């Protein structure tokens, strides 16, 4: 393929290795596992002026791109110098030269460097161009894969692990895992602030690009350009367990830092929050399908709810998650990680280590599949059109060890990228909860008004409040134009802890929160432990939004001026404070 063999010739090998020793010295002394998040394989070729490989839309570097170069790659200009350009401010690729220490938790640094090798010609890294494609790579459901496929996947992964012998090989298993560590645990800064690819609209495109290169690296290691990653089909009852190929001890796909209680076919809880709950298997599966319906349909009618909050350059990181990143993405991480035996939930239960478990990529393949599935549901479910999103950039190595810049705008169509998903039924599509636990409307007069309950210092018990809607009896046209959003402002909590709370409408605090398959269940908030390097008190503050138009219809509350809302903490609630709650109408 023409582009994948384009070289970025290294001016000197010496400068490459010396640029690593400072950042990566601890990496060499600790050969423990690293992380798996997306670059691919083969040897460093770097050229001092290889910027001829530019995507079609980038033939003319516009001001936005030039700014990316200055701020992101060269690191020569401070963000303050460029502040007037705030009207066009996509996130640039990270400045590899200033990549620093990643943090496991507050005051605890990752004991090795998560920084990638720095190409010699760092200031002229080209844009990636898709190589010619003969046939689509079809990603299969992991639980249904045959032995021939499993053998190929195991071989590719073991070959990738063997590349760890050279700790600076960007295609090595640990270097691939470290991509996630660097982008997610505070090693990079952009515009003077920490770069974080979770908790915002960067979540889906970053992980799609990460898996794209990871998959191509695996294929190149077994000389199979059609090789495709499997997806963990946790949204279907047949896939609601660790896929067998990952549960064989001694296999390259096995990781011993997993929760041992969740092996051997244990049904996964897509709302898992770090505590074992004695819920019957059928109820867990029912809850799972309910959660999928809520996250894909009810709570994500518009792009902003699905993708997450806007994150242009210069804003604080982690402005807010989209629905799928929140659930089931985060609970699957927590459920898989070994929180009983590992202090920080390693490997899957912490961003810095998640890529060290091969199942990470399988999990994220299904997360990525949800992007495609969501757009198929219809309505206003389409990609964002904001230029700051479309022009945001990341840095990856391809399977030939060539460094590239990639843009969000180039990953919106999986087929154009050369891959697709083997179809599986999606039973959650028709799993709208209709069972009601409340006949009629709950008496809101007997429930404290929102202004008396908030600000709330700690969510250490279930609380109920009544809240007034901005408009009632809305017409179909009004609903199509604007979504009704239940908004929790300044939800603050310790970001080193697991957090989950559930939200119900039209019930009081006697609600049975273990059964989610009911019309009153509105949604949940979750958080995986993570840290911001410059955040010494480790308190994160987010805005949590739930789309409730469909819920109001299903509960017969469309004509009501005031409704009841109940919050039920599941874990970490004693550390959660909420400043205020309101209902807003937002353009879809």
UniProtKB/Swiss-Prot annotation:
Protein name from the UniProt record: Catechol oxidase B, chloroplastic
Keywords associated with the record: Chloroplast, Copper, Disulfide bond, Metal-binding, Oxidoreductase, Plastid, Thioether bond, Thylakoid, Transit peptide
GO biological process per UniProt: pigment biosynthetic process
Binding sites annotated in the UniProt record for Cu cation B: 329, 333, 364
Localization in the cell: Plastid, Chloroplast thylakoid lumen
Highest taxon in the source lineage: Eukaryota
Catalytic activity: 2 catechol + O2 = 2 1,2-benzoquinone + 2 H2O
Co-factor requirement: Cu(2+)
């Amino acid at each position: 393929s023409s582009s994948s063999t384009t070289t970025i010739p290294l001016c000197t090998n010496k400068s490459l290795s010396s640029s690593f020793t400072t950042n990566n010295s601890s990496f060499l002394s600790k050969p423990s596992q690293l992380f798996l998040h997306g670059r691919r394989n083969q040897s460093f070729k770097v050229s001092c002026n290889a910027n001829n490989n530019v995507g079609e839309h980038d033939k003319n570097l516009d001001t936005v791109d030039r700014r990316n170069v200055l701020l992101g790659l060269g690191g020569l200009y401070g963000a303050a110098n460029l502040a007037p350009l705030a009207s066009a401010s996509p996130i640039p690729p990270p400045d590899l030269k200033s990549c620093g220490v990643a943090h496991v938790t507050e005051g605890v640094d990752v004991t090795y460097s998560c920084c990638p090798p720095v190409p010699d010609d760092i200031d002229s890294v080209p844009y990636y161009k898709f190589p010619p494609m003969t046939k689509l790579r079809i990603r299969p459901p992991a639980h249904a894969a045959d032995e021939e496929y499993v053998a190929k996947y195991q071989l590719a992964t073991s070959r990738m692990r063997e590349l760890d012998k050279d700790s600076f090989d960007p295609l090595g298993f640990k270097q691939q895992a470290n991509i996630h560590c660097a982008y997610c645990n505070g090693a990079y800064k952009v515009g003077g602030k920490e770069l974080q690819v979770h908790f915002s609209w960067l979540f889906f495109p970053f992980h799609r690009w990460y898996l794209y290169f990871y998959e191509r690296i695996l294929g190149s290691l077994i000389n199979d350009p059609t090789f495709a990653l499997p997806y963990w089909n946790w949204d279907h009852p047949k896939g609601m367990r660790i896929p067998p190929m990952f549960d064989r001890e001694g296999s390259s796909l096995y990781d011993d830092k997993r929760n041992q209680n969740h092996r051997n076919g244990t049904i996964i809880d897509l709302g898992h929050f770090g505590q074992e709950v004695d819920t019957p298997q059928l109820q867990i599966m029912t809850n799972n399908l309910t959660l999928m319906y809520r996250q894909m349909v009810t709570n994500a009618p518009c792009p902003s709810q699905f993708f997450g909050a806007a994150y242009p350059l210069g804003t604080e990181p982690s402005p807010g998650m989209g629905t799928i990143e929140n659930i089931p993405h985060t609970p699957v991480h927590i459920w898989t990680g070994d929180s009983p035996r590992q202090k920080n939930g390693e490997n899957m239960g912490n961003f810095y280590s998640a890529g060290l478990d091969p199942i990470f990529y399988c999990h994220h393949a299904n997360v990525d599949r949800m992007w495609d599935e969501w757009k198929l549901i219809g309505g206003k479910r389409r990609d964002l059109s904001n230029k700051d999103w479309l022009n945001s950039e990341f840095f990856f190595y391809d399977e030939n060890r060539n460094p590239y810049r990639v843009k969000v705008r180039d990953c919106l169509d999986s087929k154009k990228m050369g891959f697709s998903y083997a179809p599986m039924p999606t039973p959650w599509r028709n799993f709208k909860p209709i069972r009601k636990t409340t006949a009629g409307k709950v008496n809101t007069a007997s429930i404290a008004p929102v202004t008396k309950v908030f600000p709330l210092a700690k969510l250490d018990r279930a609380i109920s409040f009544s809240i007034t809607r901005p408009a009632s009896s809305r017409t179909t046209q009004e609903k199509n134009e604007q979504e009704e959003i239940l908004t929790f402002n300044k939800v603050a909590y310790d970001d080193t802890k697991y957090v989950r709370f559930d939200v119900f409408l039209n019930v009081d605090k006697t609600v049975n929160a273990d059964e989610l398959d009911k019309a009153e269940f509105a949604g949940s908030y979750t958080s995986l432990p993570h840290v911001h390097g410059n955040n010494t008190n480790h308190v994160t503050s987010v805005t949590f939004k739930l789309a409730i138009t469909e819920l109001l219809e299903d509960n017969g509350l469309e004509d009501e001026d005031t409704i009841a809302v109940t919050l039920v903490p599941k874990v970490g609630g004693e550390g959660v404070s909420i400043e205020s709650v309101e209902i807003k109408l937002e353009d879809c």
